[in-house]
UniProtKB/Swiss-Prot annotation:
Its EC number is 3.2.1.14. Disulfide bonds join 3-18, 12-24, 17-31, 36-40, 73-136, 148-156, 255-287. It catalyses: Random endo-hydrolysis of N-acetyl-beta-D-glucosaminide (1->4)-beta-linkages in chitin and chitodextrins. It is an enzyme of class 3 (hydrolase). Keywords: Carbohydrate metabolism, Chitin degradation, Chitin-binding, Disulfide bond, Glycosidase, Hydrolase, Plant defense, Polysaccharide degradation. Defense against chitin-containing fungal pathogens. SUPFAM superfamilies: Lysozyme-like (SSF53955), Plant lectins/antimicrobial peptides (SSF57016). GO terms for biological process: cell wall macromolecule catabolic process; chitin catabolic process; defense response to fungus; polysaccharide catabolic process. The active site is at 117 (proton donor). This is Endochitinase 2. Residues 1-42 form the Chitin-binding type-1 domain.
Length: 302
Protein backbone atom coordinates (compact mmCIF):
# COMPACT_ATOMS: atom_id res chain seq x y z
CA UNK A 1 0.00 0.00 0.00
CA UNK A 2 1.10 3.55 -0.79
CA UNK A 3 -1.37 5.96 0.78
CA UNK A 4 -4.32 6.61 3.05
CA UNK A 5 -5.11 4.76 6.24
CA UNK A 6 -3.06 1.80 5.03
CA UNK A 7 0.05 4.02 4.95
CA UNK A 8 -0.36 6.26 7.96
CA UNK A 9 -2.39 8.89 6.13
CA UNK A 10 0.20 9.46 3.38
CA UNK A 11 -0.89 11.33 0.26
CA UNK A 12 -0.16 10.24 -3.30
CA UNK A 13 2.47 12.26 -5.18
CA UNK A 14 1.51 14.59 -7.99
CA UNK A 15 -2.08 14.94 -6.87
CA UNK A 16 -2.96 11.34 -7.71
CA UNK A 17 -6.02 9.80 -6.08
CA UNK A 18 -5.71 7.34 -3.20
CA UNK A 19 -8.02 4.36 -3.65
CA UNK A 20 -10.01 2.72 -0.87
CA UNK A 21 -7.32 0.02 -0.82
CA UNK A 22 -4.40 2.43 -0.37
CA UNK A 23 -2.98 2.63 -3.91
CA UNK A 24 -2.28 5.70 -6.07
CA UNK A 25 -3.76 6.26 -9.53
CA UNK A 26 -5.78 8.57 -11.76
CA UNK A 27 -8.60 6.43 -13.15
CA UNK A 28 -12.14 6.13 -11.85
CA UNK A 29 -11.17 3.02 -9.87
CA UNK A 30 -8.90 5.22 -7.77
CA UNK A 31 -10.72 8.54 -7.84
CA UNK A 32 -14.41 7.72 -7.52
CA UNK A 33 -15.81 8.64 -4.12
CA UNK A 34 -16.79 7.44 -1.56
CA UNK A 35 -14.22 4.67 -2.05
CA UNK A 36 -11.43 7.15 -2.72
CA UNK A 37 -9.60 8.29 0.43
CA UNK A 38 -7.85 11.53 -0.58
CA UNK A 39 -7.18 13.90 -3.48
CA UNK A 40 -10.35 12.59 -5.06
CA UNK A 41 -12.23 13.78 -8.10
CA UNK A 42 -14.66 12.27 -10.56
CA UNK A 43 -12.09 11.71 -13.31
CA UNK A 44 -8.56 11.71 -12.02
CA UNK A 45 -6.49 14.24 -10.13
CA UNK A 46 -8.21 17.49 -9.32
CA UNK A 47 -6.87 20.78 -10.68
CA UNK A 48 -4.36 22.78 -8.70
CA UNK A 49 -4.94 25.88 -6.63
CA UNK A 50 -5.47 28.23 -9.58
CA UNK A 51 -9.17 27.66 -9.01
CA UNK A 52 -8.72 28.37 -5.31
CA UNK A 53 -7.28 31.82 -5.95
CA UNK A 54 -10.25 32.58 -8.17
CA UNK A 55 -12.62 31.68 -5.33
CA UNK A 56 -10.82 33.46 -2.49
CA UNK A 57 -8.64 36.44 -3.33
CA UNK A 58 -6.07 37.99 -1.04
CA UNK A 59 -8.55 40.75 -0.26
CA UNK A 60 -11.30 38.28 0.64
CA UNK A 61 -8.91 36.24 2.80
CA UNK A 62 -7.95 39.41 4.67
CA UNK A 63 -11.61 40.35 5.08
CA UNK A 64 -12.49 36.94 6.50
CA UNK A 65 -9.52 36.81 8.90
CA UNK A 66 -9.87 40.50 9.63
CA UNK A 67 -8.03 40.85 12.93
CA UNK A 68 -5.46 38.05 12.70
CA UNK A 69 -2.62 40.59 12.59
CA UNK A 70 -4.01 42.75 15.38
CA UNK A 71 -1.56 43.68 18.11
CA UNK A 72 -3.57 41.64 20.63
CA UNK A 73 -3.01 38.41 18.66
CA UNK A 74 0.10 36.40 19.60
CA UNK A 75 0.33 34.93 16.07
CA UNK A 76 0.14 38.30 14.31
CA UNK A 77 2.04 38.23 11.03
CA UNK A 78 2.21 34.43 10.91
CA UNK A 79 -0.79 33.28 8.88
CA UNK A 80 -0.52 34.66 5.34
CA UNK A 81 -2.56 34.29 2.20
CA UNK A 82 0.53 33.14 0.31
CA UNK A 83 1.15 30.34 2.83
CA UNK A 84 -2.51 29.27 2.59
CA UNK A 85 -2.32 29.02 -1.20
CA UNK A 86 1.11 27.35 -1.17
CA UNK A 87 -0.05 24.70 1.28
CA UNK A 88 -3.15 24.00 -0.80
CA UNK A 89 -0.92 22.92 -3.69
CA UNK A 90 -0.22 19.72 -1.74
CA UNK A 91 -3.96 19.04 -1.48
CA UNK A 92 -5.31 19.76 -4.97
CA UNK A 93 -8.79 18.37 -4.26
CA UNK A 94 -9.41 21.09 -1.66
CA UNK A 95 -12.08 23.51 -2.90
CA UNK A 96 -11.88 22.11 -6.44
CA UNK A 97 -14.57 19.44 -6.16
CA UNK A 98 -18.20 20.04 -7.12
CA UNK A 99 -19.93 23.18 -8.32
CA UNK A 100 -18.82 26.68 -7.36
CA UNK A 101 -21.16 26.85 -4.37
CA UNK A 102 -19.75 23.58 -3.00
CA UNK A 103 -16.18 24.78 -3.47
CA UNK A 104 -16.89 28.08 -1.72
CA UNK A 105 -18.68 26.27 1.09
CA UNK A 106 -15.61 24.11 1.66
CA UNK A 107 -13.41 27.20 2.00
CA UNK A 108 -15.88 28.72 4.45
CA UNK A 109 -16.10 25.52 6.50
CA UNK A 110 -12.33 25.00 6.64
CA UNK A 111 -11.60 28.57 7.67
CA UNK A 112 -14.48 28.55 10.15
CA UNK A 113 -13.41 25.42 11.99
CA UNK A 114 -9.78 26.52 12.12
CA UNK A 115 -10.81 30.04 13.16
CA UNK A 116 -12.62 28.56 16.15
CA UNK A 117 -9.51 26.57 17.07
CA UNK A 118 -7.35 29.71 16.92
CA UNK A 119 -9.85 32.38 17.94
CA UNK A 120 -8.94 35.51 19.82
CA UNK A 121 -11.13 38.19 21.30
CA UNK A 122 -12.05 36.41 24.52
CA UNK A 123 -11.29 38.58 27.51
CA UNK A 124 -10.74 41.78 25.56
CA UNK A 125 -12.81 44.13 23.42
CA UNK A 126 -13.40 42.46 20.04
CA UNK A 127 -14.23 45.08 17.41
CA UNK A 128 -16.32 43.79 14.49
CA UNK A 129 -17.66 40.94 16.62
CA UNK A 130 -16.16 37.63 17.73
CA UNK A 131 -16.24 36.04 14.28
CA UNK A 132 -13.68 38.49 12.87
CA UNK A 133 -10.96 37.23 15.22
CA UNK A 134 -9.93 33.86 13.80
CA UNK A 135 -6.27 32.87 13.41
CA UNK A 136 -5.11 34.82 16.46
CA UNK A 137 -2.99 31.96 17.88
CA UNK A 138 -0.64 29.39 16.38
CA UNK A 139 0.15 27.41 19.54
CA UNK A 140 -1.73 26.20 22.59
CA UNK A 141 -1.60 28.41 25.66
CA UNK A 142 -0.47 26.77 28.90
CA UNK A 143 -0.56 23.14 27.67
CA UNK A 144 -1.35 20.76 30.53
CA UNK A 145 1.17 18.16 29.37
CA UNK A 146 3.74 17.36 26.69
CA UNK A 147 1.10 15.31 24.80
CA UNK A 148 3.47 12.36 24.54
CA UNK A 149 1.86 8.91 24.39
CA UNK A 150 3.56 5.55 24.03
CA UNK A 151 3.48 4.67 20.33
CA UNK A 152 5.91 2.27 18.61
CA UNK A 153 5.29 3.81 15.19
CA UNK A 154 5.61 7.43 16.21
CA UNK A 155 7.76 7.61 19.36
CA UNK A 156 8.31 10.94 21.05
CA UNK A 157 11.63 12.62 20.35
CA UNK A 158 13.72 13.49 23.42
CA UNK A 159 12.75 16.83 24.88
CA UNK A 160 9.99 17.51 22.36
CA UNK A 161 6.40 18.44 23.18
CA UNK A 162 3.37 17.87 20.99
CA UNK A 163 0.83 20.39 22.25
CA UNK A 164 -1.61 22.11 19.91
CA UNK A 165 -0.04 24.03 17.05
CA UNK A 166 -1.23 25.46 13.75
CA UNK A 167 -4.70 26.25 12.38
CA UNK A 168 -6.17 22.93 13.55
CA UNK A 169 -4.12 22.86 16.77
CA UNK A 170 -2.61 19.45 15.98
CA UNK A 171 -1.64 17.62 19.16
CA UNK A 172 -0.06 14.31 20.34
CA UNK A 173 3.04 12.63 18.94
CA UNK A 174 1.12 10.05 16.89
CA UNK A 175 -0.73 12.81 15.03
CA UNK A 176 2.46 14.77 14.43
CA UNK A 177 4.02 11.54 13.14
CA UNK A 178 1.19 10.67 10.77
CA UNK A 179 0.91 14.21 9.49
CA UNK A 180 4.64 14.57 9.00
CA UNK A 181 4.81 11.34 7.07
CA UNK A 182 1.99 12.49 4.80
CA UNK A 183 3.46 15.92 4.02
CA UNK A 184 7.10 14.83 3.95
CA UNK A 185 8.33 16.68 7.03
CA UNK A 186 9.86 15.21 10.21
CA UNK A 187 7.42 16.73 12.68
CA UNK A 188 8.30 14.28 15.45
CA UNK A 189 11.75 15.83 15.74
CA UNK A 190 10.66 19.29 14.65
CA UNK A 191 7.18 19.94 16.09
CA UNK A 192 7.81 23.68 16.33
CA UNK A 193 7.66 23.89 12.53
CA UNK A 194 3.89 24.10 12.94
CA UNK A 195 4.30 27.40 14.75
CA UNK A 196 7.33 28.72 12.85
CA UNK A 197 6.69 27.81 9.19
CA UNK A 198 3.27 29.07 8.04
CA UNK A 199 3.11 26.87 4.93
CA UNK A 200 3.84 23.69 6.89
CA UNK A 201 1.39 24.90 9.51
CA UNK A 202 -1.39 25.21 6.94
CA UNK A 203 -0.42 21.83 5.47
CA UNK A 204 -1.06 20.21 8.85
CA UNK A 205 -4.59 21.61 8.87
CA UNK A 206 -5.24 20.55 5.28
CA UNK A 207 -3.94 17.06 6.11
CA UNK A 208 -6.43 16.75 8.94
CA UNK A 209 -9.22 18.13 6.76
CA UNK A 210 -8.62 15.81 3.80
CA UNK A 211 -7.78 12.57 5.62
CA UNK A 212 -10.47 10.13 6.80
CA UNK A 213 -9.85 8.41 10.12
CA UNK A 214 -12.13 5.39 10.46
CA UNK A 215 -14.90 5.38 11.50
CA UNK A 216 -14.93 9.09 10.71
CA UNK A 217 -15.11 10.36 7.15
CA UNK A 218 -12.89 13.23 6.09
CA UNK A 219 -14.17 16.75 6.62
CA UNK A 220 -13.62 17.24 2.88
CA UNK A 221 -15.91 14.39 1.87
CA UNK A 222 -18.63 15.62 4.21
CA UNK A 223 -18.69 19.19 2.92
CA UNK A 224 -18.63 18.18 -0.77
CA UNK A 225 -21.49 15.72 -0.25
CA UNK A 226 -19.42 12.60 -0.98
CA UNK A 227 -20.17 11.04 2.42
CA UNK A 228 -23.47 9.24 2.91
CA UNK A 229 -24.48 8.46 6.49
CA UNK A 230 -24.85 4.76 7.25
CA UNK A 231 -27.75 3.31 9.16
CA UNK A 232 -25.70 3.55 12.35
CA UNK A 233 -24.87 7.18 11.55
CA UNK A 234 -28.53 7.96 11.07
CA UNK A 235 -29.40 6.21 14.31
CA UNK A 236 -26.80 8.40 16.01
CA UNK A 237 -28.36 11.54 14.54
CA UNK A 238 -25.47 12.19 12.17
CA UNK A 239 -26.65 13.75 8.92
CA UNK A 240 -24.79 15.38 6.05
CA UNK A 241 -23.88 18.98 6.84
CA UNK A 242 -21.49 21.26 8.67
CA UNK A 243 -22.48 19.82 12.05
CA UNK A 244 -20.87 16.46 11.24
CA UNK A 245 -17.57 18.24 10.65
CA UNK A 246 -17.72 19.61 14.18
CA UNK A 247 -18.39 16.05 15.31
CA UNK A 248 -15.32 14.81 13.44
CA UNK A 249 -13.13 17.50 14.98
CA UNK A 250 -14.35 17.64 18.57
CA UNK A 251 -17.46 15.51 18.92
CA UNK A 252 -16.39 13.91 22.17
CA UNK A 253 -16.51 17.25 23.96
CA UNK A 254 -19.12 19.21 22.04
CA UNK A 255 -21.69 16.94 20.40
CA UNK A 256 -24.75 15.16 21.75
CA UNK A 257 -25.00 17.47 24.75
CA UNK A 258 -27.48 20.06 23.54
CA UNK A 259 -26.69 23.71 22.92
CA UNK A 260 -23.21 24.89 23.85
CA UNK A 261 -21.14 27.97 23.15
CA UNK A 262 -18.35 26.08 21.38
CA UNK A 263 -20.60 24.72 18.64
CA UNK A 264 -22.33 28.09 18.31
CA UNK A 265 -18.93 29.72 17.83
CA UNK A 266 -18.07 27.30 15.02
CA UNK A 267 -21.41 28.04 13.37
CA UNK A 268 -20.97 31.79 13.79
CA UNK A 269 -17.65 31.77 11.95
CA UNK A 270 -19.12 29.57 9.23
CA UNK A 271 -22.11 31.80 8.61
CA UNK A 272 -19.96 34.93 8.45
CA UNK A 273 -17.60 33.34 5.95
CA UNK A 274 -20.43 31.94 3.81
CA UNK A 275 -21.97 35.41 3.75
CA UNK A 276 -18.69 36.95 2.60
CA UNK A 277 -18.33 34.33 -0.14
CA UNK A 278 -21.98 34.68 -1.14
CA UNK A 279 -22.97 31.05 -0.61
CA UNK A 280 -25.77 29.36 1.34
CA UNK A 281 -25.05 27.52 4.58
CA UNK A 282 -26.65 24.16 3.77
CA UNK A 283 -28.52 22.07 6.33
CA UNK A 284 -27.66 20.47 9.69
CA UNK A 285 -25.23 23.07 10.99
CA UNK A 286 -25.00 21.85 14.60
CA UNK A 287 -24.29 18.53 16.30
CA UNK A 288 -26.37 19.10 19.44
CA UNK A 289 -28.31 15.87 18.96
CA UNK A 290 -25.55 13.82 17.34
CA UNK A 291 -23.70 11.07 19.15
CA UNK A 292 -19.92 11.38 18.81
CA UNK A 293 -18.06 9.09 16.43
CA UNK A 294 -15.94 6.26 17.79
CA UNK A 295 -12.18 6.36 18.15
CA UNK A 296 -10.11 8.25 15.59
CA UNK A 297 -8.01 11.35 15.16
CA UNK A 298 -9.81 14.41 16.46
CA UNK A 299 -8.91 17.63 18.13
CA UNK A 300 -10.41 16.46 21.41
CA UNK A 301 -8.06 13.46 21.35
CA UNK A 302 -5.15 15.36 19.85
Amino acid sequence: EQCGRQAGGALCPGGLCCSQFGWCGSTADYCTVPGCQSQCSGSGPAPGPGGLTNLISRETFNQMLLHRNDGACPARGFYTYDAFIAAARSFPAFATTGDQATRKREIAAFLAQTSHETTGGAGWAAPDGPYAWGYCYNRELNPPSSYCASDPNYPCAPGKQYFGRGPMQLSWNYNYGQCGRAIGVDLLNNPDLLSSDPTISFKSAFWFWMTPQSPKPSCHNVIIGAWSPSSSDRAAGRATGYGVITNIINGGLECGKGWNAQVEDRIGFYKRYCDILGVSYGNNLDCYNQSPFGNGVSVDSM
